[in-house]
Amino acid sequence: MPIITDVYAREVLDSRGNPTVEVEVLTESGAFGRALVPSGASTGEHEAVELRDGDKSRYLGKGVTKAVENVNEMIAPEIVEGEFSVLDQVSIDKMMIQLDGTHNKGKLGANAILGVSIAVARAAADLLGQPLYKYLGGFNGKQLPVPMMNIVNGGSHSDAPIAFQEFMILPVGAESFKESLRWGAEIFHNLKSILSERGLETAVGDEGGFAPRFEGTEDAVETIIKAIEKAGYKPGEDVFLGFDCASSEFYENGVYDYTKFEGEHGAKRSAAEQVDYLEELIGKYPIITIEDGMDENDWEGWKQLTDRIGDKVQLVGDDLFVTNTEILSKGIEQGIGNSILIKVNQIGTLTETFDAIEMAQKAGYTAVVSHRSGETEDTTIADIAVATNAGQIKTGSLSRTDRIAKYNQLLRIEDELYETAKFEGIKSFYNLDK
């Protein structure tokens, strides 16, 4: 039977050694689902609230016992006593949103609500004897995503003196996900050898990318291009580049202040100058995607950027849209960006996550399913990417098990789909004039 009989949460650790929420759901027939909730370092101010204890005597204030208690003492009784079916995802998500009663899930915590939401879906898939991607996407979920591999970390994700947070490679010329993953791994290892030859650090950041002390953005880009070529691939044909600028991290009082991360050598740019700079970079290098090129509240700057280069480059809104349909609809109406980053914990339920993906795709925007910098062994986002035919996934570099777990899950899914599996490569960027 599909009736949920038990919902239980506990405090566990994420990839940074910080507490996070794990939730387990059990049905009367024995179907079981478990979910672990991720956490971000650079967060948009409009994201749903991640509830932390604030008790400095435990985990430096980052404990999540309040969120755990909210699951065990508030959400669980509502679900169990309400005799909810594990198959009724939308009703359960709606009930939790109403139980919270705030616009940003600040009462119960998005980390509490999301843990339950995903665990319910996993238990439902278990009940039906289906893999999660098939339960979520039906027979139509069959497109494997192009991986955005973050092989150099900067900004808030490392101690490297570079303002941009992520430098990514996208193996769009591969014929399968399996091949794209191999290309990425080969480039990653070639990059490591190049860094070693230069006497640069090969320690990795939060998302598994290297965090060396490059001389600046262009030094990082040119070194990555050398690694692509050394691995035997053609930049701008086989493999493209991408940035996550995370501009909100260095934007203040109308100025994009690169000195925050780059010191005295960093520039200070107005919105117009920031647009000019990004346009200059895409003219010089094979860049296909730029995330958060402007501050989340600089909508005028975003409009300038979109009008200027939105037909040539994917412009992804992360802090801008925060997986929120209300904000995304305004962006679509005003012609802001052409893509949305999808982070399940930015909004807090699977139902709202799928609503955001559907809205984006109907408007001709792409949807990039994404991890967070604080991750776990949970692989749900891999299944979401395939279930929704998102076509793109951003889940870190080619190191750290918390990142590799998602790639390995996608390999399993591709094998299971066999001849029905699709990998669209460059066609996944349907928002661009190619």
Curated annotation (Swiss-Prot):
Keyword annotations: Cytoplasm, Glycolysis, Lyase, Magnesium, Metal-binding, Secreted
Keyword tRNA-binding: no
Cofactor stoichiometry and binding remark: Binds a second Mg(2+) ion via substrate during catalysis.
Record localization: Cytoplasm; Secreted; Cell surface
HAMAP family on file: Enolase
Function statement: Catalyzes the reversible conversion of 2-phosphoglycerate (2-PG) into phosphoenolpyruvate (PEP). It is essential for the degradation of carbohydrates via glycolysis.
Name of the molecule in the record: Enolase
Organism: Staphylococcus epidermidis (strain ATCC 35984 / DSM 28319 / BCRC 17069 / CCUG 31568 / BM 3577 / RP62A)
The organism's taxonomic lineage, starting at the top: Bacteria, Bacillati, Bacillota, Bacilli, Bacillales
